[in-house]
Amino acid sequence: MFSIINPSDDFWTKDKYIMLTIKGPMEWEAEIPGISTDFFCKFSNVSVPHFRDMHSPGAPDIKWITACTKMIDVILNYWNNKTAVPTPAKWYAQAENKAGRPSLILLIALDGIPSATIGKHTTEIRGVLIKDFFDGNAPKIDDWCTYAKTKKNGGGTQVFSLSYIPFALLQIIRPQFQWAWTNINELGDVCDEIHRKHIISHFNKKPNVKLMLFPKDGINGISLKSKFLGTIEWLSDLGIVTEDAWIRRDIRSYMQLLTLTHGDVLIHRALSIAKKRIRATRKAIDFIAHIDTDFQIYENPVYQLFCLQSFDPILAGTILYQWLSHRGGKKNTVSFIGPPGCGKSMLTGAILENIPLHGILHGSLNTKNLRAYGQVLVLWWKDISINFDNFNIIKSLLGGQKIIFPINENDHVQIGPCPIIATSCVDIRSMVHSNLHKINLSQRVYNFTFDKVIPRNFPVIQKDDINQFLFWARNRSINCFIDYTVPKIL
């Protein structure tokens, strides 16, 4: 984020702006019938700096840049005559190419003009432009002068805060060649900063004069589509699947999308696609066991918990690491069995904190508590209850197979394959009576029995403690051919 901008600062939010978009002609004579051959002669006194990258492919041509300077004056003259305030309205204008067509974006402060009347004023602005700029010749371009609305088709007038400009328009998420003019001096400070960061290649600033900025050439530019796809990849790599997690990690990228038209829709779409990408390409272990800081394993609460419960920490860590890596074969489930207060839920909760897509299943397997957990990276089966009616489905789920659970005649839910954590106060095998069923469970579960209640001063296990413990254990892996019960140290 720009260091000089606080998006909650009153300066960046108090003023409200409307946005006009004017489409320019790709061929002047064809799309503005009747225009005279000496149309541009009246612009001969307009001073426009020349830079080498102005003539790069995709940059707005000099005709359009020159035309924009005049159109801005025409619109502002109309606007300031309509407002009831003594000072000229604040404004920001940006010229660029969109899909090969030149365009002008103009944000104007709403001082003295109700937003409900913008439609009427836009119609009048079209007429003024045709009369005073196009010499009475109406452009033959669909929707050539429009204002931003809250909906794509219809809706009310969309208003913007000043922060929309630095977060959305000055960022390289729009077409890469942009010219801009403004009478808002504070935006000059923003331009100074992004110029130092080499986002723009040319920048002129004069006191009390329009500002002009010329973004860097296409080598460093990136389209909105590419930026959006890159954002999805970034979300997937970091396991970000909620808006809160996104804001905590990088509010700048969140704000860049939010300030665009229909930004909330783009944010939800990006998170939805990121979730699907994570489900299809990642494992739970991909989000765990990544530590780049020094630590003492003997001070780690997970290590201390397994020692307290008389387990070998290396063996326990090896089992958990292989289980999360889908390397346990049929053994797709770890169960933590013990009385309340033994630490099983605290340990499980810390594991799940590291994994972006997880589900919690309570009690017995039924349609009500399955629908929400179609495809997750880890499933916590809390207070697991096993009944004979669904045993084949339960066996497949605990064994790491994909199951399709019928909801009704026309609907179903798919679960797995994903690692399972089962917690209970009683041994899972005691829930079935058939020896065959007990054998099936033994083949699919690593069972940890926690028989000691942790002391009151025992440290709370955090998500980073899980990371440290598994990072330590992965390089100390040992053979763990265990039938069902994880052995304890005498």
Swiss-Prot record:
GO biological process terms on file: DNA replication; viral genome replication
A molecular function (GO) term: DNA binding
Coiled coil: none
Annotated localization: Host nucleus
Domain PV NS1-Nuc: 1-210
A Pfam family per the record: Rep_N
Gene Ontology CC annotations of this record: host cell nucleus
Alphabetized UniProt keyword annotations: DNA replication, DNA-binding, Host nucleus, Nucleotide-binding
InterPro entries: NS1-Nuc (IPR014835), P-loop_NTPase (IPR027417), Parvovirus_NS1_helicase (IPR001257), PV_NS1-NUC (IPR049901)
Protein's name in the database: Protein U94
